[in-house]
Design a protein with these regions (language model features):
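Active-site microenvironments that recognize anionic phosphate/pyrophosphate groups
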Residues: 2-189, 195-268, 272, 285-359
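A generic alpha-helix signature
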Residues: 151, 276-279
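Internal helical hairpin/lid segments
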Residues: 278-286
Length: 359
C-alpha cells in the first residue's frame, strides 16, 4: 500500500494497513474547488484523512500549496537582550527563589550549564522551570546542542525524582517546552517547564488509558509501534533506547516522537536516556531551522501511578509552530482548538524523510 502519496483507491474508500496488532486507517477524500489560476474552473483536489490507531484522533493531510515558510523572519529585535530577564545569569540568583532544602540542599539544581528553579506560576502541585543556559539570553534552534538539551532534561528529571521522593502522591509527571511567543512562551530566554501532581494532563491520561486497553487485548502498543515502524517511511532513527519516528496521524506540523524503550515514567529516565533524548531533539531542531522554522513545543510524559502495569512507555512529542512574524497566521484554527482535528500540509512520511538524514 502507498503511504507517502495518495493511494490509488476510489474517493471515500478506506485502506487498512495491518502489521502485527496495529491497523493504520486512512481514507482518500476528493474535493471540488474553483481554481482561480484557471479562471475559476472547477478542479478536483485530493486530501487524506487518517485515524490514530491508539487514540482515535484524526488528521487531514492536505495536498497542493504548502504552508512551509520560504524564508525566515529576522529575530534580531525579538531576541535582543533586554534590560532585565530573570533567567539571565546576572539576575538568576536574585530574581529566582531556591527550592526547599528537602528537595535539594543546593537550592537550585544544576547540570552542566542548565539550572532548574521553582516556577512562580502555579500550573501544578509541583512545577519547575529549567534554563538551558543562563549565560545566553537567546539560543537559536541550530545552536541547541545535544549537551545543552540533554543537560537541561537531566536536571529536570532530577527535580522530578526529588518531587516524587518528598511527595509520593505526585505520580503524574511531564516535562515541556514553549519556545518563542507563537508556542506560548512568555519569556524569550529558552527554558523548559514541568508539572507533577496527582492528576494527569488530559492527553497524558488518554494515552495511558488507551495503552492499558490496548495491552489487555494485544500486548504493548508502544513496543509493537516501534517494531512495526522500524526502517519504514515514518522511521527517523534510533539513539540509545530512544526510537524516533513520525506519527501516522499527527496533531501538529513537523511532529516527531521519541519513544523510550522499557521506561514507563519520567522519574525512571537515566542520564544516558536524557543524553539520547537531547541528541535527537537537537537534530530535529536543527532540521526545523533548515526549513526556515523558528518556534516549537515539546512534551515528555510519564505514565502515572500504574505506568508499567498499564503498558505505557515514556514518549516525547515535538512539533513546530508558526513563525514569529509581526502579523502571522496561527497554526491553531477551529479545526485544532475546537474540534481536535489537525490540518497538516506535509505528510509524516515527508517530515521523516527530511529529518532522517541527520540521524
Amino acid at each position: 500500500m502507498c503511504l507517502s502519496s495518495p493511494c490509488p483507491s476510489a474517493a471515500g474508500a478506506t485502506t487498512v494497513i495491518s502489521v502485527t496488532a496495529i491497523d493504520f486507517e486512512e481514507r482518500d477524500l476528493e474535493a471540488s474547488v474553483p481554481d482561480l489560476a484557471a479562471g475559476g474552473a472547477w478542479t478536483r483536489v485530493r486530501l487524506r484523512w487518517r485515524r490514530d490507531p491508539l487514540t482515535g484522533a484524526s488528521a487531514r493531510i492536505l495536498t497542493g500549496e504548502k504552508l512551509q515558510p520560504s524564508s525566515r523572519p529576522d529575530l534580531t529585535e525579538l531576541t535582543a537582550k533586554p534590560a532585565f530577564c530573570p533567567f539571565d545569569s546576572e539576575y538568576l540568583e536574585t530574581a529566582t527563589v531556591p527550592f526547599p532544602a528537602e528537595l535539594t540542599a543546593e537550592g537550585r539544581i544544576r547540570v552542566g550549564r542548565a539550572v532548574v528553579v521553582p516556577n512562580i506560576m502555579a500550573y501544578a502541585t509541583h512545577s519547575a522551570v529549567g534554563i538551558y543556559d543562563p549565560g545566553r539570553h537567546f539560543i537559536d534552534l541550530d545552536e541547541m546542542t545535544p549537551a545543552l538539551v540533554g543537560d537541561a532534561l537531566t536536571a529536570m528529571v532530577r527535580h522530578a525524582q526529588a518531587v516524587r521522593r518528598v511527595d509520593p502522591a505526585a505520580q503524574w509527571s511531564s516535562i515541556n517546552a514553549n519556545y518563542l511567543p507563537p508556542a506560548g512562551a512568555s519569556l524569550i530566554h529558552p527554558h523548559l517547564q514541568s508539572a507533577h501532581d496527582a492528576h494527569g494532563l488530559t492527553g497524558q491520561r488518554l494515552l495511558v488509558e488507551r495503552s492499558r486497553a490496548w495491552k489487555e487485548r494485544h500486548g504493548s502498543y508502544w513496543t509493537a509501534l516501534v517494531q512495526q515502524e522500524a526502517d519504514g517511511p515514518r522511521w527517523v532513527g534510533q539513539i540509545g533506547r530512544v526510537a524516533w519516528l513520525t506519527p501516522f496521524a499527527p496533531t501538529g506540523f513537523g511532529e516527531v516522537w521519541g519513544v523510550v524503550a522499557d521506561v514507563a515514567d519520567v522519574t525512571e529516565l537515566t542520564d544516558d536516556d536524557c543524553r539520547a533524548l537531547g541528541q535527537g531533539l537537537s537534530q530535529i531542531l536543527a532540521a526545523y531551522r533548515a526549513q526556515n522554522l523558528a518556534s516549537f513545543n515539546f512534551g515528555l510524559i510519564g505514565g502515572g501511578p500504574h505506568a508499567h502495569q498499564d503498558g505505557h512507555q515514556v514518549v516525547l512529542k515535538v512539533l513546530s509552530r508558526s513563525n514569529p512574524e509581526p502579523v502571522y497566521r496561527s497554526d491553531a484554527t477551529y479545526f485544532e482548538r475546537i474540534w481536535g482535528e489537525a490540518l497538516i500540509d506535509l505528510s509524516p512520511e515527508e517530515v521523516a524523510e527530511a529529518i532522517r538524514a541527520r540521524f
